[in-house]
Curated annotation (Swiss-Prot):
Sequence motif: 'KMSKS' region, positions: 348-352
EC number(s) stated in the UniProt entry for this protein: 6.1.1.10
Bridged cysteine pairs (disulfide): none
Cofactors: Zn(2+)
Main location: cytoplasm
GO molecular function: ATP binding; metal ion binding; methionine-tRNA ligase activity; tRNA binding
Compartment annotation: Cytoplasm
Name recorded for this polypeptide: Methionine--tRNA ligase
Binding site for ATP: K351
Catalytic activity reported: tRNA(Met) + L-methionine + ATP = L-methionyl-tRNA(Met) + AMP + diphosphate
Length: 720
């Protein structure tokens, strides 16, 4: 829906009442909600409230994602059963969502009978359709804990840079990716034991089946975000490429989750039953409230289904989930909306700097949750762009927009109306041109919200607030009040101001629902909907005494928030020390810390900022790939011959073979680290490093992308 679709106030009323099911990604049940999570839940909640204000039948569904090895191991560490842990975390998560006004119709758990039944039925339907395969695979196995180990539960020495204590899938020092079998001196993070290789039968969803590929090629054409469509097409490849791989949907005991029907000791991988949890939570609500569940989720249903997610889990929601639904006889998502990541003050959230901010610490510090809702909304749009919470800008924007512009309007007019006119507006003032302008703008503001262009909606709203304040400044009600002869003009000014304030409150209601409730009580009106733009204040209903709606952000509150989250880091560290660790892990941690000290100093820890002098040590150069070939005997490496403007070319080995054919790269410009010490490899000498991007979780969002400068750059140019 675009602004042109809504050209009048009347257009804000629904032409037909839609049935809409909306979800946000499920938070994992082994940690606290932080402000990075809240971006998504606030984004979704604003959209849901917008649709409800149109009068549609909307259900916003959520749940905790409870299964998997991390939950099982954390519960063991805390001396709890997994059930006890997830029940406690559910209470904490529900508290945090309530604090920030996230209006779930049902917030449930994936560890439920409804989810078990639905997961089993979907699995059995896929099996009936010939889309489940059994295969023997070899995995790392902890002989002490008698369990198979996920990649992130294995550590060892990086096979590339030889940094100690690195995860089984990637090195945090040099950034290399590799297989767990390539780690040197590996050990289990659970027990400290050396893993052994063990074969096990696993179950796979046959995503490579031509039926799945054909369906997904058609389904992707309906995605609203071009970035998502492009990424999907990249994963699918061209017709005939057969790029889709089958998906391992099983895990071996011990595992906290649902056992696979007919497969004792085998459990559904958490990513199979987690999205089914959307339906399970909705089923729980339907059973309580007498809603026809099947009418909403069966194939061919006219109900709409939307998923809001982070861009890091696009892979699961646009490949596996739609295909699972399609071939198990369910409706597929109407659309999937992905958002970007959150940074704080331009950097990754950091515990050492206090910017890894938990939802509860924000509330405990006394900060208004609607301040954060407003700030995030002012940054959000319909793309997958990352957004930044700049704490200075947060303070300035809240104080300027919400207090200085918006709330100030009511405080300047309400007292005069109550004192001089018995709290009753002048009915003729409801036809004032300024009021008409605001009334007409509501339709386009509502359309911006529905199009997920929240920043546009708020920009338009604040531009209107500026006009209202200019009107008040020009009319000067405080001067008019000095002379009884100006009573009519004073009455009009106050009435226009308060009706404008009502319309601005309507425009802000999806973002600041609690302020809207207070405004509704102040005016003595029913909950505002979009159609109420055409229902102005009336002299028949006097306003109530004005109560202050919002305070300014105090810089001391921001300081306290950062301090509280730095304190939480210290508390976590103290708790970890008190809880203790295995002797094997403690010894390895101490040894690896010493071994990695130089590497960390050179590369920088995630949370430690580097100086400009440190950055200046890295010599980044534009390089032209003049030749490229596969490396015989390596599944990952390409050999690049690079021209960086020197007398001789450079030879570089790069682990990008999975993403590029050699002929694709010849002639391209890229960026390389030119002053990296040469490294002797078994295939030859590597004289630098080319830069490439990848997702933090390459399993969830696979892909490598070399950096390419804009046209005009030439080999040898410095990047600075």
């Amino acid at each position: 829906m675009s602004a042109s679709d809504l050209t009048s106030v009347q257009a804000t009323a629904p032409q037909g009442r839609r049935q809409i099911l909306v979800t946000s990604a499920l938070p994992y049940a082994n940690g606290q909600i932080h402000i990075g999570h809240l971006v998504e839940y606030i984004q979704t909640d604003i959209w849901v409230r917008t649709l409800r204000m149109h009068g549609h039948e909307v259900y916003y569904i959520g749940a905790d994602d409870t299964h998997g090895t991390p939950v099982m191991l954390r519960a063991e560490k805390e001396g709890l059963t997994p059930k006890q842990l997830i029940d406690r975390v559910w209470t904490e998560h529900k508290r945090d969502f309530d604090s920030f006004g996230v209006s779930f119709d049902n917030f449930y758990s994936t560890d439920s009978d409804e989810n078990r039944v639905l997961s089993e039925s979907i699995y059995l339907a896929l099996k009936e359709n010939g889309l489940i395969a059994e295969r023997a695979i070899e995995q790392a196995y902890d002989p002490v804990k008698e369990m198979f180990l996920p990649d992130r539960f294995i550590k060892g020495e990086c096979p590339k840079c030889h940094a100690k204590d690195q995860y089984g899938d990637n090195c945090e020092v040099c950034g290399s990716t590799y297989l767990p079998t390539e780690l040197l001196n590996p050990y289990s993070v659970v027990s400290g034991a050396t893993p052994v290789r063990k074969t096990s039968t696993h179950y796979f969803f046959r995503l490579s089946d031509p039926r799945c590929e054909s369906f997904l090629r058609e389904w992707v054409s309906g995605l609203a975000q071009p970035e998502a469509t492009n990424k999907m097409r990249e994963w699918l490849g061209d017709a005939g490429e057969a790029k889709l791989a089958d998906w391992d949907i099983s895990r071996d005991a011990p595992y906290f989750g649902f056992e696979i029907p007919g497969a004792p000791g085998k459990y559904f991988y958490v990513w199979l039953d987690a999205p089914v949890g959307y339906y399970a939570s909705f089923k729980n609500l339907c059973d309580r409230e007498g809603i026809d569940f099947d009418a909403w989720i069966r194939a061919g249903s006219t109900a709409e289904q939307y998923h809001f997610i982070g861009k890091d889990i696009l892979y699961f929601h646009t490949l596996f989930w739609p295909a699972m639904l399609e071939f198990s006889g369910h409706r597929t998502p109407t659309n999937v909306f992905a958002h970007g990541f959150l940074t704080v003050d331009g950097a990754k959230m950091s515990k050492s700097r206090g910017t890894f901010i938990t939802a509860q610490s924000y509330i405990d510090t006394g900060l208004n949750p609607e301040w954060l809702r407003y700030y995030f909304a002012a940054k959000l749009n319909a793309t997958m762009e990352d957004i930044d919470l700049n704490l200075d800008d947060f303070q300035a924007r809240v104080n300027s927009d919400l207090v200085g512009k918006y709330v100030n309007i009511a405080s300047r007019a309400a007292g005069f109306l109550i004192k001089r006119f018995d709290g009753r507006v002048q009915d003729s003032a409801m036809n004032h041109p300024l009021v008409a302008k605001l009334r007409d703008a509501i339709a386009s503001i509502a359309a911006h919200y529905e199009g997920r262009e929240y920043s546009r909606a708020l920009r338009q709203t604040m531009e209107l607030a500026d006009e209202v304040n200019a009107y008040v400044d020009g009319a000067k009600p405080w001067e008019l009040a000095k002379d009884p002869a100006n009573a009519v003009a004073l009455h009009e000014t106050c009435s226009v101001s308060l009706e404008a304030f009502r319309l601005l409150s309507l425009a802000l209601k999806p973002v600041m629902p609690r302020v809207a409730e207070a405004v509704e009580a102040f005016f003595g009106v029913a909950p505002l909907a979009w159609a109420d733009a055409a229902k102005p204040l009336s002299s028949a209903q006097p306003i109530k005494a004005y109560q202050h709606l919002m305070t300014r952000v105090d810089p001391k509150q921001i300081d306290a928030l950062l301090a509280a989250n730095r304190d939480s880091l210290q508390a976590d560290a103290a708790g970890a020390a008190a809880a203790g660790t295995t002797a094997a892990n403690a010894a390895k941690d101490a040894k690896s810390a010493k071994a990695n000290a130089k590497a960390v100093a050179a590369n920088g820890a995630d949370d430690a900022p580097i100086s400009i002098d440190d950055f200046a040590k890295v010599d980044l150069r534009i390089a032209k790939i003049v030749a490229c070939q596969a490396v015989e005997g390596s599944d990952k490496l390409l050999q690049l011959t690079l021209d960086i403007g020197e007398e001789k070319t450079r030879n570089v080995f790069s682990g990008i073979k999975s993403a590029y054919q050699p002929e694709q790269l010849v002639g391209k410009l890229t960026v390389m680290v030119a002053n990296l010490a040469p490294r002797k490899m078994k295939f030859g000498l590597s004289e630098g490093m080319v830069l490439a991007a990848s997702a933090a979780d390459e399993k969830a969002e696979p892909g490598l992308y070399i950096l390419e400068p804009h046209s005009g750059a030439k080999p040898g140019m410095r990047v600075k």
